[in-house]
Amino acid sequence: MKRSTERILVTHAGSLPRPEDLWEMLIAKSNDRPYDREIFARRLRSAVAEVVKKQIDCGIDIVNDGEFGKHSFSDYARERLGGYVERAPDPDERPPAIFGRDLVDFPEYFNSKGGRAVVGRHALRFFCNVPIKYIGHAAVKTDIENFTAALQGVKVEEAFLPAVAPGTIEHRLKNEYYPNDEAYVYALADAMHEEYKAIVDAGFILQIDDPDLADGWQLNSHMSVSEYRKFAELRIDALNHALSDIPQERVRFHMCWGSYHGPHKYDIPLRDIVDLILKVRAESYSIEASNPRHEHEWRVWEEVKLPEGKVLVPGVAGHYSDFIEHPEAIAERLVKYAKLVGRENVMAGTDCGLGTRVGHPKITWAKFEAMAEGARLATKQLWGR
């Protein structure tokens, strides 16, 4: 895995804005509506090539495919894993929400049309009712082939493909088959190992997306911190099981606090889970760090030593706002981290994927350009050139 040995490198967390025509086909595919599969396949390949070039043009060093073949976490998991049925929950059942603790203080916000994260009650959900198996071989092969084609003739520092952690899949696909949480999460880990290995065997960096690690705290609003740490540790152990034969230097780990637009008043503090994050078998750790609830947590690294050989990728541009971060503010953030963990151990990242979370694709590209300029300013301060 590349490091910032000569300058601060720039990357991002994954999801990028899909072209409108591709997005319409993804929605049709997700909803089992008719769409032309050949047109979709051709457009997906051309769109991935376009978004790779766009990332390079904006100054991104470590690029991905924009996750263009995926509509949502739930659809992605359904496409890659077998063993699930889709049905409505019981009439009185309200699925746990990633803002469960905030909901107690702000029910009016979450139940209003003005609240951007709205409480749902009767949406269809997925339930595991037979043994899980991996069925995503064709889908991940398509991801790999499209990305490989897009990288031909272009120059990047590195390339990554994201895949979802077992614990995050567990949130969306509920267990009705396995005897307990441990058996279920480890079954998910065994299945997802096939995708993780396929990505690394293709020569790409594997990014593990795991918002579960932090947003599970709000989902399980009845738990104390100590109870939640046990809950999270089991899921990290399962993830490490899935990564056990994959070289750590080929893995980057991304976590955030759920990425919903809302108060985030009761997000679990980074200091309560940072040691768990560092247990993950990865070389780099991408952590939400630029928004008003978590920006102050750079100070956690005054007390916590980043392990030798690891890389920290703090979010220096956010997905919660359409504000374009000033390059000087981005540089300040990067320099703070570099002074604590070493300049070669820091890369510029985003809080989460910007794909569907900012108001317009041009906002995403402007944020990327600001990150690249901020990294140049930070490099000048840290290297004197």
Regions found by a protein language model. Give the residues of each.
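Domain-level signal for soluble alpha/beta catalytic cores
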Residues: 1-385
